[in-house]
């Protein structure tokens, strides 16, 4: 089997640009493993396909505003996607922008595009765009002011409501990306399970 066996054409206009309302009205593709029959249902029908003893595993972390926009000393744009907090001011991150080697600095921009007093310095380089960055101040105090909820690269519509990319059972902050498989659950559906 080759990975290319799973390639298929998906027209861009068929990709939803915002979550469906209500959440459980999203479509559900069901495969009958015995017969190979495929049926199309809605996510709220999920309990019809689960049996006693089945287990659902969920990611209950809240998505943090982990996408930061910044400016290099040259004036060029830079983007930081926070992945893992190493200490109060140090993060492992993906950084988009050329020539951001060890020692490079990025001034973080606020949501209006203005420079803030928050500066990130690249302290270690990894493969591809992976870097360790140290902020000159603890980032927790800044995230809500300067950070954006990261969206998948195929979503081009600006996010109107950050809560739409949180699951209804999200508790501890920590995800750098929305656990999209869990976005379809509603309180009523969880009670039905």
Locations of the language-model features?
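A cross-family signal for N-terminal binding/gating loops and helix N-caps
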Residues: 1-193
